[in-house]
Regions:
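"…together with the soluble PPM/PP2C metallo-phosphatase catalytic core" -> "…together
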Residues: 1-179
Length: 179
């Protein structure tokens, strides 16, 4: 309760930087993201129950990533210390987004072999993204969803540390990587 209250006070104090009223603008992206997760989860549940070939799982990841890119969630520019591409071509943007989603999904999945590693990294990533979303004035739905993910992972971590009592499985680790 105390942590929830502190979080709520922080969000309320930063309300002038958070975009509260743009949910209408993001509904297509949100539905695309949720449908992409649904597709990946379907493939991974089958993999958790009955092992499927890696190419089949990769196909599911590609389908999910394509759905996300088609919904409008894209890497539209790259700004790094030595690379500054504020706008990239639309086809390059779509391909880069699909590749990024599949690569990160598989990276988190591969890290799931050690107790608490993928969950711990996902918590750090989620908290970092939450701070970035708040500072950049992202839509409130983005802040709420990433905070919910971080909170769920913080609650899960004690059960996933050595000796682990609960595991993510392919469905959980692919969900974290995809998210």
């Amino acid at each position: 309760f105390l942590i929830s209250t502190i979080y709520l006070l922080i969000v309320m104090s930063m309300e002038h930087t958070i975009n509260l009223f743009d949910f209408q603008q993001y509904w297509k992206k949100l539905l695309g993201f949720l449908f992409g997760i649904l597709i990946i989860s379907a493939f991974c549940v089958v993999d958790d129950i009955k092992t499927i070939k890696p190419i089949t799982k990769l196909t599911g990841q590609l389908i999910g990533a394509i759905i996300v890119a088609a919904s409008g969630i894209r890497i539209e520019g790259i700004t790094l210390p030595f690379i500054n591409l504020p706008e990239i071509h639309e086809i390059t943007s779509v391909l880069l987004t699909i590749a990024w989603i599949v690569i990160v999904t598989n990276a988190i999945n591969l890290m799931d072999g050690l107790d608490g590693l993928s969950s711990g990294i996902a918590v750090i990533s989620a908290i970092s993204l939450m701070v970035i979303f708040v500072l950049n004035g992202s839509a409130l739905i983005s802040v709420v969803l990433i905070t919910a993910l971080a909170g769920a992972l913080v609650g899960f971590l004690p059960f996933n540390f050595t000796p682990a009592k609960t595991f993510l499985g392919d469905t959980g680790s692919n969900f974290l990587g995809f998210s």
